[in-house]
Each structure stands twice: as structure tokens, then as C-alpha cells.
Amino acid sequence: MNSKTSEKTEVVNGEILHTPDHLQRHLTPRQVQFVAIGGSIGTALFVSIGYGLMRGAASLLIAFVLHALVIAQVNNSLAEMTVFMPISAAFIHHASAWVDDAWGFMIGWNFFLFEALLIPFEITALDMVLTFWRDDIPSAAVITVCIVLYALCNALMVKYFGETEFWLAGGKLLLIGILFFFTFITMVGGNPQRDAYGFRNWSKPGPFVEYIDDGDLGRFHGFLAALWQAAFTIVGPEYLAIVAGEAQRPRTTMKAAFKSVYWRFGLFFIGGALCVGIVLPANDPTLLNVLSSGETGTGAASPFVIAMKNMNVEVLPHLVNALLLTSIYSAGNAYVYCSSRSLYGLALNGHAPKFLTKCTKQGVPIYCLFVALAFACLSFLKLGSGSVKVLTWLTNLITGGTLVTYIVICINYLFFYRALKAQSFDRSDLPYRGYFQPYGTWVALVWLMAVEIFYGYAIFLRGRWDIGIFFSNYTMGFLAICLFCSWKILKRTQFVRPEHADLVWIRPAVDEHEAAMAGNENEVGLRRRPAQLVRVDMKLSRASRSPRV
């Protein structure tokens, strides 16, 4: 976005090897899909969802449905922009190019920080889940092994990382399938007690559980607590935008991947919220002990594993816990990948030190990877403070950062939409056109800002003030404001005028990429022989700094 560059692109057997940002396009469509699954499904869905269940099964389900609809609209907006301009860390680049350079600086660092914080979160959760089998496993050893494995997986060529993540994410799909079948079979009587319990657990103590206060007000507080859990759990579109620059077929691959987000939300998140409320009551003693008092050594931080033990189901709890470990590891692996790529995007834009742009011959931003792994060392805090306390700190920080990211994506889209109109660009010519625009984005923006502001409201109620919880809830929001204002003042940046927003940018390069690949595949099909090396020299219009107000 800062200066014009030229790009040399290689197409070998239908694969684009080089991209404008010097990463390599090795990720196949199935790998892109599974990287997104790996990043969006992990501890939050299988373990932390228990916090929402404590507020009532109905509260949990309604909260998940409402928030999933909002994030689906965020996906709708992000898909339109990313398929149009498929570059690595897309929404970070979009923020700088279409809104304000200070806006891109802020969201880049916000996304990097909360993604990097997710790494120790997953490692700490993995260590806690291991206590299902033994309490005496040394946490320091578990943490060290995780960090080493993450380093090895991410230091390999991207195509091997993608294949690794494909199989790890496949384990998550298997786990979700097992949990769904377990729910249905046991609720109709297929359990050791032969008890067809149906939806009985919804009434224990009730579909909406009182929290903080009594009566209807208490039940409303309970719903809000479940909504905060939904805000932490339901994620996904941003991970697709991060890998857009490394997809083999940037337009066709990303379009299909973004469309798949909708059924993932419905099946995984809403389905998971429904199932957990069926198999376990909100007032289960083990659930309350683990999540309220912070006891570990039960496994059982996962509500599904607790339900299996309550029904005296043999073997299956061990299988589920083993798959849960691979699920948590997979999520952490994806977070190392995404945080290193977001930091790389910052360095390319001049928002981080230039040395971070160094890549290996295989296209891995090696110094960015080292920085991401340094954050993993925060998981050693668990040795002094305990798993549950550290998870709570990290959860609050991560949720705040996630909400900031989605707010930025919505504002990016509103500026993008305004630029299309100002430059008389017909939206019907876009490779992907979102629905209900721009009204859906406005609704999502208002909802997300309300959740961000009121996320920690409970500490302002009489007798509930806690300065530690206050800072963990609001640090990311305050930090975003400080980052934006400081960079804007320091660099004297200005908002991009809609008529001057760069809507050309990398489009010619991407169009030529796709044309080169299509031609290569046609040659293979017609001649029935291995494709020869095709080299396409093209100039990339990564326009010099756009005129600004």
C-alpha cells in the first residue's frame, strides 16, 4: 500500500507460488477450510462453554443464536472485501487503505495481541484437561513440549503446516460428531441407566438461571453472562482473511470458504450450545465445583465429559478427552500461525520493525514466528496462579480484543461501501456480494459496540467492584483507542476520502493469477501431460499512499 512494487509469480502444476507480500500460495481449498476450523473451534466450545451453561440452557442457546447471527453479518461484510482484495491479513490492510493508516496500525496490533494471548490460553487449558488422567503430570513439562511442537509445525513449509492443520482439524470434526451422536443416543434412552431423559435437564434448576439478583432481573443477568460467553466462543471469519494471501486460488477458494462459515456457525456453535444443555443440568455439582471454585484434576472441565461420567459411560470419556487434547492443540497451532502472519502484515505496512519482514526460503516469516512463540511462555504463569485464574484473565482480554476486531471490520466495510458509491463502482460486478448491505453491517456494529461497552458491567454493581477484573475486561478496548490516537497524532494521518480510496490495488495481479492458473489447467486437460513451468511477470499496482483528507 505504500509504494509500487513488481511481482514475479510462478505457476507450477496449477499452484501459484509467490504473492505480493512474499508469502507463498501453497494452501489448497480444503486446507484453507480446515485452518479456519482449527482456529475457530477449540477450548471455548468444548470446555469454557460450561460457564455459559451455568446461567441456564435456554439462556445459553438464545445467546449463541443471537450472537451467531451478528457474527454471520460480520462474515458477510468481510467476505465481500476479502474476495475483492485477497491479501494476507486482509482486514488489517483494508483498514489502512480504505479508512486511515492509524486505523490499520491499531487493528493490526490489536489482532496480533489477542491472537498471541490465545496461545498461552490453549496451552493452559490443555494442561488442565490432562489432569483427567493424572494430577501429578508436571505442568512445566507439558508447556515446554507444546511450545516446541508449535515451533516445529510452524517452521515447516506452509504446505506442510496446512496438511498438519488439516488432519488436526479433522479430529475436531470427529469429536463434534461423537458429541452430537452421544447427545441424541443418550437422550432417547441409549445410556447405562436406560433413561430417556430428553430435555429434562433444562428444568434443573430452570431454563433461565438467576445470577447476581433474584427474579426476572437475575435471569436477565444470567442471559447477559451467557451472551459474554458467546462473544468469546463464536469466532471464525477473521482466520479466513488472515490466510487469503496464501490460498492457491484466492478468489474462488476464499469465496467458497466464507460461504461455509454460515453452516459452521449453525452446526458447531449453535448445535454445541443445544447439546451441552441437553446432556448436563446447569446446577451439576461437578460443573459448579470446577468452574466456580477452580478445582482441577477432574477432566472434566468439559461439560460433555462430566455428563458421560454422570451416566457411568465407560471408555468414551477417555476417547473424548483424547480428542479434546488434539482439538486444543490444533487451535493453539492455528493461533501461532495467525499471530505470526498478522505481525508480518504489520511489518509490511511499516507498523512494526522492518526486520520482521524476513522470510525463510519456504515463505515462513521466521522472526514473527519467534515473537508469537514468546507469548506462549505466558502459560508458565499457571505454575504460580493456577489454571482457572490464568484462563479467566486471558478469556477477558481475548474477548475484548475479538470484539474490537469485529467492530473494525464493520467500519472497514462502511468505508469500503462508501468508496464504491463515490467511484460509481457497481456492486453487482464484485466477485462476491454480501446480503443486506449496508444495513446489516450497521446492525452488527451497534450490537458489537454495546457488547464491548457492557461486557464488564457487573463489576459496577454495588459490592462487586474488582480492579483486576475491570482491567482484564476493558484493557483491549482502552488499548485500541490509545493505539489509534497515538499513531494518528504521531504520524498526522488523515481519513481516506471515498473518491480517493484505492479500489485497484492488487486486483490486476490477482486477476492475472487466476487467468494463469486457468490457462495452465486447460493445457493439462487438453494435452494430458504434466504442466510445464509457466512464469508470469507482472507489475503490481500497490499504489503509492492514497490522497487523504
Q: Residues of each region from the PLM?
A:
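Membrane-interface "cap" regions at the ends of multi-pass membrane proteins
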Residues: 1-50, 54-58, 71-72, 76, ...
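Membrane-helix boundary/coupling elements in multi-pass transport proteins
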Residues: 87, 110-124, 229, 234-246, ...
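Helix-loop-helix connectors at the membrane interface of multi-pass transporters/channels
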Residues: 92-96, 122-143, 241-250, 259-263, ...
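Helix-loop-helix junctions that connect adjacent transmembrane segments
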Residues: 134, 170-315
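Membrane-interface loop-to-helix entry segments
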Residues: 140-204, 235, 258-266, 395-408, ...
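C-terminal membrane-solvent junction of multi-pass transporters and transport-like membrane proteins
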Residues: 358-363, 406-473, 497-503
